[in-house]
Design a protein with these regions (language model features):
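Alpha/beta enzyme core
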Residues: 1-45, 54-247, 258-287, 293, ...
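Short gly/pro/ser/thr-enriched loop/turn and capping motifs at secondary-structure boundaries
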Residues: 83-86, 251-255, 323-326
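C-terminal helical cap(s) of enzyme catalytic domains, especially alpha/beta-barrels
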Residues: 89, 327-341
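Short, basic, helix/turn surface patches
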Residues: 103-111, 243-253, 340-356
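Active-site proximal loops enriched in glycine and acidic residues that flank catalytic Cys/His/Asp
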Residues: 220-223, 247-251, 296, 317-321
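Substrate-binding cleft of secreted/luminal carbohydrate-active enzymes
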Residues: 304-330
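Conserved small/polar residues in nucleotide/adenosyl-binding loops
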Residues: 368-371
Length: 371
């Protein structure tokens, strides 16, 4: 926020210097035009969602971290239900989640931080990674059948135990659904969930989060598929009708291949001839001008509108886009600058476009001196 405010000061300072010059020159037309720019100036300061991962510790650590973020200017805090000490990227395998009681305690801790600092309308985004998480670090505490802990434990994969002779030394046993269950435990001590329970766990995560202080949901998925997202959101809205979803249009997805395969599959189901396409090779540039690729691009273009309409997505975001644009542009510039184009690679590919598009950093001293 400090840099954003400095950017405002830089832009407004330049406008006021232009205003002084226009007045000194008795140029009334230019003066009115500059005053209009000042009156309609759009600040660089925008709302920021602070991502605090899994809270970096227990609920007390989460509370302290959230306070720091809010004091720094964050209007929204995003927190996820992975374990703090073995957290993975949302699109990697091996994710481990925590029982609902642990996660809900952190949601309440964030709310307390907002309240203590006098922010009545602070936003909490509760993210669930359960769709791609096949493991849990601990068995949930349960006091009676059907409570939240019991529901969490019902997703554990394991073997029914008939007698004590079925147990080995150190085995853990859970009573669930009227039976004794020995959860499948890895050498690391982690417990495995039943296969194909991810969507059910996501739905339960989201409902309980909204019922315990969260404002928005974030469902981490393995692919950008409107039907999959809508299937989960519709189930959530059966319990919480006004549930709203934040969705990450992640660069981790191979959008081109994924949507081309979605079109391939839908066409195949419709009985259309897809014999000229190799499904696993659809990323190839050889397909770029085909009807399938054109339809896939159309679906990508309308993804945000389609997902908002059909899947209840309230806010679309894209994580780390500038990381990728910086890497790509730097790679291209290096190839051109040290290749045949030489300095023209920079001038034609960067500076000429900056000047014509009115990019403020054409004169780097304006911003480098702010740091």
């Amino acid at each position: 926020y400090t840099f954003l405010r400095q950017a405002d000061a830089r832009e407004l300072g330049g406008l006021f210097r232009q205003l002084d010059a226009a007045r000194a020159a008795n140029n009334d037309v230019q003066e009115r035009a500059i005053i209009n720019q000042i009156d309609n100036f759009q600040t660089h300061v925008v709302p920021i969602i602070a991502d605090i991962d899994a809270g970096f510790g227990n609920e007390e650590a989460t509370y302290l971290l959230a306070k720091k973020m809010i004091e720094a200017g964050a209007c929204a805090i995003q927190i996820e239900n992975q374990v703090s000490d073995e957290k993975q990227c949302g699109h990697q395998d091996g994710k481990v989640t925590v029982p609902h009681a642990d996660f809900l305690a952190k949601i309440r801790a964030v709310r307390y931080a907002f309240i203590e600092l006098g922010v009545e309308n602070g936003i909490i985004v509760a993210r669930t990674d359960s769709l791609g998480a096949g493991l849990t670090k601990q068995i949930a505490v349960t006091n009676e059948p059907g409570d939240l802990g019991d529901q969490y434990n019902s997703f554990l994969d394991g073997d029914v135990v008939q007698t004590a002779d079925d147990l080995a030394n150190g085995d853990v046993v859970v009573k669930a659904n009227g039976q004794l269950l020995r959860p499948k435990r890895l050498a690391s001590g982690l417990f495995r969930f039943k296969p194909n329970t991810g969507e059910d766990r996501v739905v339960l995560d989201c409902i309980t989060s909204l019922q315990n202080g969260a404002d928005l949901l974030w469902i981490e998925t393995e692919k950008p598929h409107v039907g999959q997202i809508a299937g989960m959101v519709n189930r959530i809205r059966e319990v919480v009708p006004n549930a709203k979803l934040v969705y990450n249009n992640s660069p981790s997805f191979n959008w081109t291949l994924n949507f081309r395969q979605q079109v391939f599959d839908s066409w195949a189901e419709e009985g259309r001839d897809v014999s000229t396409y190799a499904r696993d090779e659809l990323m190839s540039a050889d397909y770029d001008e085909t009807d399938l690729a054109i339809e896939a691009d159309r679906r990508i273009q309308s993804f945000q509108a389609d997902a908002a309409r059909e899947a209840g997505i309230f806010h679309h975001l894209i994580t780390l886009p500038t990381y990728h644009t910086a890497a790509l542009s730097t790679d291209n510039l290096a190839k051109e600058y040290f290749g045949e184009a030489g300095m023209l690679g920079y001038v034609a590919g960067v500076q000429r476009k900056e000047i014509r598009q009115g990019i403020a950093c054409v004169k780097p001293v304006s911003y480098t001196h702010l740091t």
